[in-house]
Each structure stands twice: as structure tokens, then as C-alpha cells.
Amino acid sequence: MDDHRLQAGELARLAGRDGPVTVLKRTMGLERTKVLVVRAGDVVVKAHPPGTDEKALRARLDAARALDGIMLAPLGLERLDGRLVTIWPAGEPLTMDDVEAGTTPWEEGGRLLALLHARPVPAGLPPAGGPSRLPRAMADLASAGVPAPVAAPILEAYATLPPVREGGALTHGDWHLGQIVRHGGGWLLIDPDDLGPGDPAWDLARPAAWFAAGLLAPDDWERLLTAYLAAGGTAVSADDPWRELDAPARALTVQLAATAVATGARAGEPPDDAAEALVSACERIVAAARAGT
């Protein structure tokens, strides 16, 4: 196997599956495949980044197995040329038909997050990985050759952010609509790579950031938030959810903006509409911080 470009067929054979293989995701690092996710028959196989902490991953997989009805349970953990590889039942992800029909599962997402946040944190589970994504995104921004005028508002917004609030709830750590699939007749959360104790508002922060940037329709945001609260979610206050959401939503805005413009710069492309909306949101964060001083 080429160590610089992990082969999809190798993953399928590791799972004991032959036949057509579909690459669902491939993320490249500087010189080699960082993450590779493939579907082979009725399973999905994921090669994790080099250097993934095996103890932490095993703890998260064990936690996912115990979240029946909330999170998809793994089928196994293997190794391939030093890489940790997880094997999963294949679920049915969100499709464009769902989006066009107005049946995106915002309510199910809110309900599942509320159920997750109500579960006790298993002993030995590492902290939620979501907050650590922000400094990584900023490091990526710094190394991607982003033009200074584009990077400036992101850097300025980053400087205004408060420290991450600690929390003891069981959280997903990186939730968005790509982290939910249909399986066994219902929707389930997937991808426990960042699962752990943390501030539960962080799990609502990405859609909150989209909403604040004008990238998520108000009705969709309301569907998610209403369902979350109706299911007993405690991450935010019903009377003023932004009291808890403001800081993590600003952090996710900065993270998403940094990732978007860095990705575009590496591809030699200007910021797209979504990236521009996120950068504009960073400018508003800076303006609000200046107005408050």
C-alpha cells in the first residue's frame, strides 16, 4: 500500500468486504492521506489520522456502544499499516432530496443532542475535542498563505474570544447535520471522535454560528432549538439561549471562517459566498467587541 495515499480497497478488504467501494471522504495532509472514509457493502470503514490516541479512541468507542438509540455503535477497531481503522454499520446520510423536501432532520438532531447531554459521562472518557479544533484552525490559517486583508478580521475576532467555558455534560464535540444518519428505522448520531465531557452549548454552536452569519434559515434554527428544549436539553436557557450560546457561537464562527479561507487559499481559489459570510460575521464580532469597550 502507498503510505502517501491510503488506498480505499485496502480498507474494504480489512472489513472483509468485496465488490464496489465508494470513497465518502478523503482528507489529505501535506504528504499523505490524513483521513479516509469508504463504504463497502453494508459497512463504512474509517482510517483515522496518523498519531490518533488509541486509548482515547477506544474510550470513545466504548461510550458510543453504550448510547443505544442515540449514537451508532461501532463494529470494530483494527489497524492497517500503523493506522487505527474503525468499522461501522452503513447508515443513510442526509440527502439533497431531504433538503429540497424541507425534511432536514433538525428536530431529530435537537432531540438526540438533548438525550446525549442528559447521559452520565463514562469514567475515563477524555475531554470533548471540539474546543481544540479552534487553535488548529488558526494554525492552518497561518500556514495557508491567506492574503492579509482576508485573514485580518478572523485574527482580530479570535483575539476577542473569552476562554472556553468548562462543562461536565456528555457532548458530541463536533455536531452538524453531517453527523446524523438513518439506521434501524430512525436517526442516530455518528462520529464519536470528539465525544467527551464539556460545555453542551458547544454542540449547538455550529448551527448557531451559521444562523448568525445568515447561512442557516431562521425557521431551521428555531426547529433545532425548539426540539432541543422540548426534549429536556439543558445547554441553554429557554428565556435567553444566547446567554450560553454567544461565546461558543463566536468561537465556531472564527473556526469556520479560518477553515473556509484556508481551504480556498490552498486550492488557489478566492473565498466563496459562505466563506465571505463567515468573514463578515467575524467583522461584526470585532465591531461589537470595540463597541463594548
Write out the residue ranges for each language-model feature.
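Active-site acidic catalytic loop and adjacent metal/ATP-binding pocket
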Residues: 25-45, 159-202
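Activation segment
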Residues: 50, 93, 187, 195-197, ...
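Active-site activation/catalytic loop segments of kinase-like enzymes and analogous catalytic loops
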Residues: 201-234, 250-268
